[in-house]
From Swiss-Prot:
Protein's name according to its UniProt entry: Protein EURL homolog
Segments for region (Disordered): 185-206
Keywords, sorted A to Z: Coiled coil, Differentiation, Neurogenesis
Residue ranges of coiled coil: 228-251
Length: 290
């Protein structure tokens, strides 16, 4: 076969774009996910991995992707089987029902004559509140001594919600930092402008203005000195703007990577390790073909 008749294979999918951040980059900086590769070597099946070998991207992007994916999926919960999880939930529910029924019957038998002052009956007459707390919270005892203490207590379910809200504040952290950075720089610029203006006011301003008559009346040395000051001021402003633009670009890039990673996690939720437990549980009910 002649050299002119030889075919060249072209990969149409090779567009030098990171699959995580969706930004164009050099081909040498792209590689497959090293975290999924190490998990595969440890024995994790390919169906449970987040990325395949065909997915290319930056090393930092893959690390941030797995960091976000592992925030809500702890290894302690993943190690439990489906039967253990269901057994724990059912046992908690049954124990809570038994405790609630026992406390309710004891209070009704001991204080049935005090209908107007009974905490349980007063609690039932408030339809805007829930009659039953969450099943995994501590069962309240409806007695005259314990009503004052239980009124201000917070259930463990509410505490977990508050902790979850504190952990998910990272989504607004970047925006707050950017806003604080902008307000800090703006206030600092105003302070420098106020301090630079002395008692004369018109001569030592940040951006002085000179008329044509004033410039014509200056000597050559004064004009050269004024030009040097203006060039120095322009250089300082340029460096400050460059620094602000670089910080803004870095914050925007990090925020973009987080948003793209969250969107892909929502789209590929079936591949998350925390959902593989339920999938294996449903497969166990299927009949096996011998």
């Amino acid at each position: 076969m002649n050299e002119e008749e030889q075919f060249v294979s072209i990969d149409l999918n090779d567009d030098n774009i990171c699959s995580v951040c969706k930004l164009g980059t050099d081909k040498d900086t792209l590689s497959f996910c090293h975290i999924c590769f190490e998990l595969n070597l440890e024995g994790v099946p390919k169906s449970n991995l987040l990325h395949t070998k065909s997915v290319r991207g930056h090393k930092d992007c893959f690390e941030k992707y797995h960091l976000i994916a592992n925030q809500d999926c702890s290894r302690s919960k993943l190690s439990k089987s489906t039967y253990e999880g269901v057994k724990t939930i059912v046992s908690k529910k049954i124990n809570w029902i038994v405790q609630y029924a026992q406390n309710k019957n004891l209070d009704l038998e001991s204080e049935c004559s005090k209908t107007s002052q009974h905490p349980l009956l007063n609690f039932r007459h408030k339809p805007e509140k829930k009659l039953l707390p969450q099943f995994d919270s501590q069962v309240p005892k409806y007695s005259a001594k314990g009503s004052a203490g239980n009124a201000g207590s917070i259930s463990s379910y509410a505490q977990r919600i508050l902790e979850h809200r504190e952990n998910t504040d990272f989504r607004l952290g970047l925006l707050e930092d950017a806003d604080a950075l902008w307000t800090h720089s703006h206030s600092q610029a105003q302070k420098t402008e106020e301090t630079s203006s002395g008692p004369e006011g018109t001569i030592q301003t940040q951006n002085p203005h000179y008329s044509r008559e004033e410039l014509n009346s200056m000597t050559l040395a004064e004009v050269v000195q004024l030009s040097a000051k203006l060039q120095q001021r322009i250089q300082e402003v340029f460096e400050e703007l460059t620094h602000q633009v670089q910080e803004k670009d870095s914050l925007a890039s990090e925020l973009h990577v987080r948003h793209v990673a969250i969107e892909q996690l929502l789209k590929n939720c079936s591949k998350l390790p925390c959902l593989q437990v339920g999938r294996t549980g449903t497969r166990s009910h299927l009949p096996m073909n011998h």
